[in-house]
Amino acid sequence: MCDLNEPKDAHYLPHLTWPEVDALRRRTDVAILPFGAIEQHGPALPIGTDTLGVIAVARAASRKVDALCAPVLFPALSSHHMQFPGTITLSEETFARVVMDAASSLARHGFRRILLANGHGGNEAALAYLAYRITRETEAASLLFGIAELRKIYLTAEIDKLDIHAGIGETSSMLYQQPQLVRSERLEQPKMALDPWREALLRQVRDDPSLLRYITLGLPPVHEISSNGCITYGDPHKGTAARGRELFDAYVAAMAEFVEAWRAATGPAVPAPGG
């Protein structure tokens, strides 16, 4: 999340001076606001997996479409992981206030299209509602680019069955993005104990990834359904850096295409204040 030796990123808000932000907002009114989590990811992956992944994708996408990438907002909504040490969660009320304040700040500075880029399933329902609130209560319009889009990419990459947490997909992503943080010797397939109705819905997920939200909504505490904190029916040992690069490139391209389609549908940028 913070590499002291990384080169300056001209689209990443923490790297910019205020005059540089001023110049950027006169070219574009799009800001990408990424959301991750600080929560357990099984015995082999870092607790910051969601955060590390989404900020890398959001930054790469912002460079492709000439948008501002705000810093990731974390921790987030992870109460279902609290039986595992290291997880930090916010209440829904606190999370909503933080999101609304961040979006209001960006809108005030002239970023009138705010993309909520979500990298954690536990945030999805709240962010869908908050995108609506941002549009109604601030000067900006907001859309959510969320987990359904990621699921479509997983299926294209032939990720096995239900693989939503610390499985093949996220292991691959971390092996590509942050291999030094992966404890490969501790990778193991969990014993899963999902409710029968969720098991039955898995067949539908193969055809329509957006249905995954109905499996994960109201999910019991993770320690009750997984032996090690991973939520997958696949084998994390199948994760590879090559597959991680494939997922990363596809996710960046999908996010960039989403922003460009939004621009095409809604017209040119709104001039920034004083611009």
List where the protein language model places each region.
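Extended, histidine- and acidic-residue-enriched regions that form the cofactor-binding/catalytic faces
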Residues: 1-80, 85-93, 97-113, 121-275
